[in-house]
Amino acid sequence: MCIRDRVVYDIHENTIQSILQKKWLNPFAKLIAIVGYFILEKLSKLFFHHYILAEDSYKSFIKNNSTVIYNYPIIKDYNHQNVKKEYDLVYIGDITEDRGALIMIKTLLTLKKSIPKINLALIGNVPPILEDALIRSISRNGLDNNIRLFGYMNYYDAMQIVCKSKIGLCLLKPKKNYIESYPTKLFDYMQVGVPFVCSNFPLYDNLLNKCNAGLSIDPLNIKGISSTIIGLFDDSEKYNNLSKNGINALNKEYNWLAQENKLFHLIQSS
């Protein structure tokens, strides 16, 4: 690499926190990985002219020469207004225990007591270490007819399933990497007018205070989650308002267009 070159580096993850959350790494391996990344990060500052950060929280470890550019979705027409709802609940994203896989199963089991035919669409990759346990848990709890595992799908096809769903889920566990980062799935739900139920982290609550497109709840409170979902099913006026608010907020602010302009300006001025 020529030192005279100007390099802009894009950071989309808090890598150290991500390493700490890897359950398949033993403590020694985590320590080696973290120290290695820390050294690499320090050395990178000798070569990188500017950093693009996907979250405000990343400013804590990249304080200078950085610009926050949020990973908002590109607005597309998914014809969501004319789609028949086939799924009561939907989740899009990697399916792991920390991202709420077992929480969603427990919630569905509770909901099934009052809504026997309730169904959940799970869209995303399931790591091999969890896949067998997840399938066994679904079968053991008699939820084979209530949960559909779509696996990994391209973005457009995944959004077609989201369009066919009533309520989006984002019940991430209170891990530091999640608490301080916006999950893009919230904006995916908003784009097609799907109200969502999410974890009650301060960052998420701040978003809800601005756009009023969903509801937040303690992700470890299964009864509370279930009651919140049933409340949305039963209150069509509230449901419709949340749906409209999400679409309006996404179109006005939480889309890629404004971020794209920031990115172009940054690169042109670098």
Task: Identify the residue ranges that each predicted region occupies.
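Conserved acidic donor-binding segment of nucleotide-sugar-dependent glycosyltransferases
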Residues: K210-I222, G231-E237
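Nucleotide-activated donor-binding/catalytic signature segment of Leloir-type glycosyltransferases, i.e.
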Residues: G124, D132-Q160
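A short, well-ordered alpha-helix in the C-terminal region of glycosyltransferases
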Residues: G224-S227, G231, K238-E253
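Acidic anion/phosphate-binding donor-loop and adjacent secondary structure
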Residues: K63, T67-V68, Y72-Y87, G100
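Short, small-residue-biased leader/transition segments that mark boundaries at the very start
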Residues: M1-I3
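Acidic donor-binding loop of glycosyltransferase active sites
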Residues: V162-I179, V194
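Conserved donor-binding/catalytic core segment of Leloir-type glycosyltransferases
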Residues: N82-L108, L120-L122, S243
